[in-house]
């Protein structure tokens, strides 16, 4: 089965990594709109247009399924993209919510949603969580993480300063943290380490990783099995510098 993965840049590598590990598909076409990253600071109309333009990119590749591996596009462009597509299109928000439903029974558990400004303002996660009965929800726009990750700054003083800026003012400490941007799993260990090192948490917070969640979602929805193929063929495309994107993929995904 040949599928597409669409992201604003390199954040979708976190989803791609989970897909490659599961070996569900024979061929994956990855498209990063790196010339226009970040999406999270742009208005909803622009993001919808970017999503429709991504559909145009994938048409000649004849994919059978498209994964929108970008939370901002999933929140604001997914429905519009689905209207104009003849193939199934899956976003990352619904799988993440279902992952929480499976793992978190306490409807009053404090849940913190991290995301870009556009994702947080869309209330997509808040609304989806409330539909499942979760009541104790807080959210935080952590858009500065995106350019740091795009520049491969995954540790060090600059990232620590950024986490301190965002997390120090928190009044309610989370039991669950939704990594509501596919860039964020790339610094998941640093986020967990910050909370354990700076707050008196009895146990590490549960981190919801959209890449792992979407693999579980696809397995259930389409009856897919792990190791269905030996190793998927991956082809990279970008609206910006594709050589840079491929170099980042080799570094992060060990291709």
Swiss-Prot record:
GO terms of molecular function: glutamate racemase activity; identical protein binding
Keyword Cell wall biogenesis/degradation attributed: yes
BP term (GO), one: peptidoglycan biosynthetic process
InterPro entries reported in the protein's UniProt record: Asp/Glu/hydantoin_racemase, Asp/Glu_race, Asp/Glu_racemase_AS_1, Asp/Glu_racemase_AS_2, Glu_race
Pathway assigned to this chain's UniProt record: Cell wall biogenesis; peptidoglycan biosynthesis
Positions annotated as active site in the UniProt record: 70 (proton donor/acceptor), 181 (proton donor/acceptor)
Binding-site residues for substrate, renumbered to this chain: 7-8, 39-40, 71-72, 182-183
Top-level division of the source organism's lineage: Bacteria
Keyword Isomerase on entry: yes
PANTHER family listed in its UniProt record: GLUTAMATE RACEMASE (PTHR21198:SF2)
HAMAP family recorded: Glu_racemase
Annotated protein name in UniProt: Glutamate racemase
Gene symbol of the encoding locus: murI
């Amino acid at each position: 089965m040949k599928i597409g993965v669409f992201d604003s840049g390199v954040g979708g590598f976190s989803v791609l990594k989970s897909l490659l590990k599961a070996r569900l598909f024979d061929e994956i076409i990855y498209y990063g709109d790196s010339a226009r990253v970040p999406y999270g600071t742009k208005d909803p109309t622009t993001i919808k247009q970017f999503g429709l333009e991504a559909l145009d990119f994938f048409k000649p590749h004849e994919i059978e399924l498209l994964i929108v591996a970008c939370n901002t596009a999933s929140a604001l462009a997914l429905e519009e993209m689905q209207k104009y597509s003849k193939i199934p299109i899956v976003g990352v928000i619904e799988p993440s919510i279902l992952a929480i439903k499976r793992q978190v029974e306490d409807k009053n558990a404090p849940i913190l949603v991290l995301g870009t400004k556009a994702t947080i303002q869309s209330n997509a996660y808040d609304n989806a969580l409330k539909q499942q009965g979760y009541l104790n929800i807080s959210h935080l726009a952590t858009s500065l993480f995106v350019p740091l990750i795009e520049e491969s700054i995954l540790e060090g003083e600059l990232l620590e300063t950024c986490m301190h800026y965002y997390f120090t003012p928190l009044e309610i400490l989370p039991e669950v943290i939704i990594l509501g941007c596919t860039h964020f799993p790339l610094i998941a260990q640093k986020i967990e380490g910050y909370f354990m090192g700076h707050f008196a948490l009895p146990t590490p917070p549960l981190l919801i990783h959209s890449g792992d969640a979407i693999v579980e979602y696809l397995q259930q929805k389409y009856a897919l099995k792990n190791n269905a193929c030996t190793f998927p063929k991956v082809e990279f495309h970008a609206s910006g510098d594709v050589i840079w994107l491929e170099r980042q993929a080799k570094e992060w995904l060990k291709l």
